[in-house]
């Protein structure tokens, strides 16, 4: 039986998620056509006296996961629909059907709340290439990982030498901002090349653009739809966002001019050069294109590697086995894709952390371009905005003792013929929707797994690490977001690595 639910989604920074397009959320109702024969779904956190959804917003911020579970548990019949804000929430049992059906459009699923029609929010291509670039550009980057592995390793070395230092004495670092800067520098090597990836001005943009855009979006969405095209010109956060974008354009332009002057020059791949060739003369905004790629990749990957590193520090018995695995994989040569692919324990630790600490509680945001009848009889009316919950990630029938962190869980799963297909970090399936699923699954997941493995290899082989227990590092849940305490710290000190990276 299909299960789906509905919730009022609060409007606020704490409940804004960013998935493949800097997705912001709204509490606007989406009414079905009067001619629809499908009954309008009830709402889980709706109160008859709550005319302005104030109670609904507070409920959602405080216990979004519980409300999603409640709604899914109350789905009674195959045609039942429930909706939060403008989103219909489906169970992951329908992830295969939604993910493989072309009638569910991803771009239209996020466009209504992206504010792309407002100046400063249009972090997409313009004209004929609108919406068409991020996926192929990311896929093109993924296909060149064999050639990008060593550059990624070089940037990791450069960053750690500067930021973590070569000191053999223990010293503390605040995890998230440091890992965000590391991720920005490494990924920017693939996006904008070796010069800009170490430019402090570009790295400042890469690490702050998402938060600036989120803040501006929240400010705009406090106003009615009719007023938004006017008020955004005067809101300080929106003016700051536009200035931020202009600085990015100014930094990108000299590098783009160099590419135009030497189109046949044999050089390391960058998405900046690839997109210029892909455009084939069409007018586009190179700065916005890079911000789109950088923001999406940096924000989610930084969050992921922060959580993984803290998990490792919370389970120090994993450190030496992870080191041993890395030493064995790298022995006899530098870091290469083939070596990274042998690190099954590291991948298991990464996936287990991701399973327990998803950045976003919902996935697969879609728009129904026509009425669709899903398996089991669930009817999705044309024009419905929907998303998929992921209760299977905590299903004890799939993951024994599901609330417990088990770094070896997916190592054992690889050895089980029936479940081996669930083990790889980049494999999408209904039991783990962190990268989406189906035809429009995140193409950047292959880049993320390599970048994170490279970072962990350098960190674990070159440094001793331990958690600063006096500083809070617990998970913080707010709305749909699950993040580590931003003040979480670790202690590090330089050690002599057993093999050269």
Swiss-Prot record:
Domain of life of the source: Eukaryota
UniProt entry keywords in alphabetical sequence: Alkaloid metabolism, Glycoprotein, Heme, Iron, Membrane, Metal-binding, Monooxygenase, Oxidoreductase, Transmembrane, Transmembrane helix
Keyword Iron in annotation: yes
Predominant localisation class: membrane
GO-annotated biological processes: alkaloid metabolic process; secondary metabolic process
Binding of heme, residues: 442
Protein name stated in the entry: Cytochrome P450 monooxygenase notH
Organism (species): Aspergillus sp. (strain MF297-2)
Cofactors required: heme
Family, per entry: Belongs to the cytochrome P450 family.
InterPro entries, A to Z: Cyt_P450, Cyt_P450_E_grp-IV, Cyt_P450_sf
Residues carrying sugar: 298
């Amino acid at each position: 039986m299909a299960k789906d639910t509905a919730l009022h989604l609060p409007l606020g920074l704490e409940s804004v998620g960013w998935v493949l397009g800097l997705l912001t959320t709204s509490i606007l109702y989406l009414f079905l056509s009067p001619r629809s024969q499908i009954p309008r779904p009830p709402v889980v956190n709706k109160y008859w006296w709550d005319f302005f959804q104030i109670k609904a917003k507070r409920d959602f911020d405080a216990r979004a996961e519980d409300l999603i579970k409640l709604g899914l548990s109350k789905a009674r019949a195959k045609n039942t629909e429930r909706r939060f804000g403008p989103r219909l929430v489906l169970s992951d049992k329908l992830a295969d059907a939604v993910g493989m059906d072309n009638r569910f459009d991803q771009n239209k699923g996020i466009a209504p709340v992206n504010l792309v029609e407002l100046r400063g929010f249009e972090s997409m291509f313009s004209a004929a290439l609108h919406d068409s670039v991020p996926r192929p550009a990311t896929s093109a980057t993924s296909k060149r990982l064999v050639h990008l592995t060593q550059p990624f390793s070089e940037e990791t070395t450069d960053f750690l030498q500067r930021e973590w230092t070569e000191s053999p004495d223990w010293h503390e670092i605040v995890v998230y901002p440091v890992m965000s800067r590391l991720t920005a520098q490494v990924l920017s090597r693939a996006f904008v090349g070796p010069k800009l990836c170490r430019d402090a001005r570009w790295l400042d943009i890469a690490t702050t653009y998402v938060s600036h855009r989120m803040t501006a979006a929240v400010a705009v969405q406090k106003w009615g739809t009719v007023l938004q095209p006017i008020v955004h010109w005067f809101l300080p956060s929106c003016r700051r966002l536009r200035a931020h974008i202009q600085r990015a354009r100014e930094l990108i332009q000299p590098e783009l001019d160099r590419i135009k002057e030497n189109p046949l020059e044999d050089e390391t791949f960058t998405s900046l050069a690839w997109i210029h060739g892909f455009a084939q003369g069409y007018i586009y905004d190179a700065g916005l294109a890079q911000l789109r790629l950088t923001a999406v990749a940096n924000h989610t990957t930084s969050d992921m590697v922060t959580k993984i590193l803290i998990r490792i520090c919370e389970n120090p018995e994993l450190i030496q086995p992870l080191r041993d695995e890395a030493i064995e994989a790298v022995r006899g040569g530098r870091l290469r894709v083939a070596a990274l692919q042998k690190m099954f324990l590291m991948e298991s630790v990464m996936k287990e952390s991701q399973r327990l600490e998803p950045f976003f509680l919902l996935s697969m945001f879609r728009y129904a371009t026509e009425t669709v009848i899903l398996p089991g009889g669930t009817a999705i009316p044309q024009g419905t905005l929907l998303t998929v919950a992921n209760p299977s990630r905590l299903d004890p029938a799939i993951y024994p003792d599901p609330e417990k962190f088990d770094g070896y869980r997916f190592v054992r799963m690889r050895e089980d013929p029936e479940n081996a297909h669930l083990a790889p970090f980049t494999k999408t399936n209904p039991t783990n929707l962190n990268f989406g699923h189906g035809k429009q699954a995140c193409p950047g997941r292959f880049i993320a797994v390599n970048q994170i493995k490279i970072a962990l290899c350098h960190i674990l082989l070159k440094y001793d690490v331990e958690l600063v227990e006096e500083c809070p590092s617990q998970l913080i849940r707010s709305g749909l977001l699950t993040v580590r305490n931003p003040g979480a710290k670790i202690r590090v000190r330089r050690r002599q690595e057993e093999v050269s990276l």
